[in-house]
Regions:
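Conserved short alpha-helical segments that host acidic/polar catalytic motifs at enzyme active sites
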Residues: 1-355
């Protein structure tokens, strides 16, 4: 699937996110996994930092390079994926309390890495692995042997290009992830500045970074669902609200008026196609009003593929019933729940399930 999309690559990078992980990690669903790239000195600093806080290593995977380093890929010491047992003095914490402790640790490690240029930390969260690298996606995937048998997952999010409006940076590679919420985007976010400034004003430390204008889609998803407590059906009402005339005739007029006004700085102008994943591994796809970026969903026998091109579906599930391929329109949120039975639609014109 990665190679067939190569016409759209520019060598700027590749990112892969794994959720609902199999193999050795399948028995470690509730403990945090740290993913990142480290120099030898950075790895020592990581070990000291984590031991000082009471974390102990449960299991680890390191990526051994396959052959010569591809053109454009910097020399790295260690690509690391490591699962940790929680500190023993946290054993009385609820699951919610445990999860609250993880993001500050990731942010602190990222700060340490930025200061010394010796570590890049992509994620620190249960049942989550993220690896990113600059360079040609197909060459990088072969170099890191991303098809290894001990690294499997039921949800794989992969994008072969980062935002190239700015300097190339590992943190700018899609997909983006925050506390169980993930997105990757095809397109440009022309409303980036107002989106970013609104999110950064919320007083939540995780709304941070923004080396890509597409990272705001992850954070706005987190804001609307986790921070405000709304459902997925409200995501598009937050970023692409109905026009005022349509709101006046909607069954939830008062609520949608208030949401549009309160979250007006989250509104996007496109062109964007966004693919996302929720903490329970529900997958979805949305389009902006202009619908100038392609997006299609197809599936067969419990396997669904979300892609910007039909050739991506053909490469992964060639024998599916193509009559059921679906391309969401601008009012749709196309959803595949964790049971992976069918594509369900949430339409902005319909009554909200919860408000």
């Amino acid at each position: 699937g990665l190679a067939v999309m190569s016409e759209g690559y520019d060598g700027s990078g590749v990112g892969i996110l794994l959720r609902d992980i199999g193999g050795p990690f399948a028995a470690m669903k509730h403990i945090p996994i740290l993913s990142g790239i480290f120099s030898s000195s950075g790895l020592k600093r990581l070990d000291r930092f984590m031991m000082d806080r009471g974390f102990t290593t449960k299991y680890k995977v390191t990526f051994k390079a396959n052959g010569a380093r591809p053109t454009g890929v910097p020399k790295r010491d260690v690509y690391l994926v490591r699962a940790y047992d929680y500190p023993t003095d946290w054993e009385d914490y609820s699951q919610e309390a445990l999860l609250r402790e993880l993001m500050p640790i990731r942010l602190r490690l990222q700060e340490m890495g930025a200061a010394e240029k010796d570590m890049v930390v992509f994620s620190f969260w249960p049942d989550t692995i993220m690896i990113k690298e600059v360079g040609d996606p197909v060459a990088v995937a072969d170099y890191l042997q991303l098809d290894r048998k001990d690294l499997t997952a039921r949800v794989i999010m992969l994008q072969g290009r980062q935002n190239t409006n700015y300097e190339i940076d590992l943190y700018a590679c899609h997909p983006f992830f925050l506390q169980g919420y993930a997105t990757m985007t095809n397109g440009e976010n022309t409303a980036f500045i107002q989106n970013r400034d609104f999110l950064m004003s919320r007083g939540f430390d995780g709304y941070h970074g923004y080396l890509s204008d597409s990272e705001v889609f992850t954070h706005s998803l987190h804001y609307l669902i986790s921070y405000l407590g709304l459902g997925l059906e409200c995501y598009k009402h937050g970023i692409t609200p109905l026009n005022d005339d349509a709101i006046e005739t909607h069954p939830d007029t008062a609520f949608l008026k208030h949401l549009k006004y309160a979250c007006r700085s989250l509104i996007i102008d496109g062109p964007n196609c966004v693919i996302g994943c929720l903490p329970d591994t529900t997958l979805f796809m949305v389009q902006d009003r202009k619908k100038l970026r392609p997006g299609v969903i197809g599936g067969s026998d419990g396997t669904y593929v979300f892609s910007s091109e039909i050739c991506g579906l053909d490469a992964v599930i060639p024998h599916r019933d193509k009559q059921h391929d679906f391309q969401p329109m601008h009012l749709d949120t196309a959803v595949v729940t964790p049971r992976r039975l069918k594509v369900e639609l949430l339409c902005q014109a319909d009554p909200l399930m919860v408000n």
